[in-house]
Amino acid sequence: MAFMGIVARRSPPPGILAMTDTLHASHAAGSAISAHAHTDAASRDAALARRYGAEAVPPAGPWNATIAGLLDHRSVRGYRTNDTLPAGTLETLVAAAQSAATSSNLQTWSVVAVDDRAVRADLAKLANGQAHIEHCPLFLVFVADLSRNRRIGERGGATLAGLDYLETYLVAAIDAALAAQNAVIAAESLGLSTVYIGALRNDPARVAALLGLPPGAMGVFGLCVGRAADGAAGEVKPRLPQPAVLFRDRYAAGGEAELVAAYDPRMEAFSRRNEMSAARWTTRVIARLADAAALSGRDRLAAILRGLGFPLR
């Protein structure tokens, strides 16, 4: 109908309007998803290139923030001075650690948070003078601990002869490692940095004495946790190409020499950029494992463990 020269226009039915709005919203959402997927792909490719080198990036696969955080891991040996962590950080990390898998739910590990500065200084000294043990705001010693289960047996009138075997010690060491790695992942998700201290195994008996560990308990490694000092984080360290460690159905070392030869210069370049020893990775492997002396006292570990209450039958 026309009135005064103006043509009256009919409005679209409500259903058509709703459909149009839905299509516009779907298009916008699709564009956002596409952009997000593109960003994720770029993030994934960059992270894999940092970890393996651009020449050895494995095939693309699923990706999320958790995987991105894992690939961004690096050991940090410099921490902010006089720093403190938020209240509850220790307990949160231990909750994450206790959420790791544990063989048969035996829970054969414990952890000691070391605050005593004199004890930290002694631990740093036996660990080849690693000063970050003294300076980090949180230092943990993860313990392969069969003593708790031994006490459970004693209270129940059982001797638990199964605790005396190498297998059970191995379970405890693995439990401690799994727990610690969960703690590391949790710490890094909170923006904290970490470094493991395997050099505590230079003198496990001294570590046990310093921490008051009972027989059947051994400090397998330490862990520094804190906020990285400026410039301390460094780069992500390259790893061996996946075909050097990933096999399908059967172990196959046929192409290993070529893969390791390709990795050596990548690791050498990383070391030069980060002001480390420029020796090739293979050279370091040979030096680190050349003889008993290269183990810094750890060649006596079996005897020391027996002295700490692990018969290792």
Regions found by a protein language model. Give the residues of each.
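Acidic, surface-exposed loops and disordered segments
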Residues: 2-313
